Amino acid sequence: MTMPQQPQVNVNISQPPLPPQQPPVRQSNLRTKRSLLKYVLLGLITLGIYDIWQMSEVGETLNLIATRRDGKRTMHYYLMFFLVGWLTLGIGWLVWFHKLSSRIGTEQAARGLPVTVTAATYWLWNILGSLIIVGPFIYTYKLLHAMNDLCADYNARG
């Protein structure tokens, strides 16, 4: 009677180890040159189209930067501007900017950057600041520069 033979396992020890996992390669660096002057002037020249595009780009960029960390997604601004904002008689815009500002502040804190934009910044500068006319401009300046800082940090550290 013959004994069944054990299968032979070929272990090749001389095989080189797998290379370490590389982080996903970013296709291009994120924009870091948002400015209030360009936002206002191009907004006037294009009758607001540039402003809509810029806020859409801010939301998409924030999704790219922060979704890994917090698991949230900001609603696309085109959907907010053309549909939800009008259907909710403006309340949708208030909620969208509140959440956007809060998320920017949270991401700044998580990355160790100075927190310059929060939900309070939105309510105090953009809403109450409307009474002194320059408040919304100050809020927009802070928002655009906070996004520039986040994008620069993302370009440097991922």
What are these regions (language model features)?
Residues 2-84, 92-129, 136-158:
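Membrane-interface extramembranous regions at the lipid-water interface
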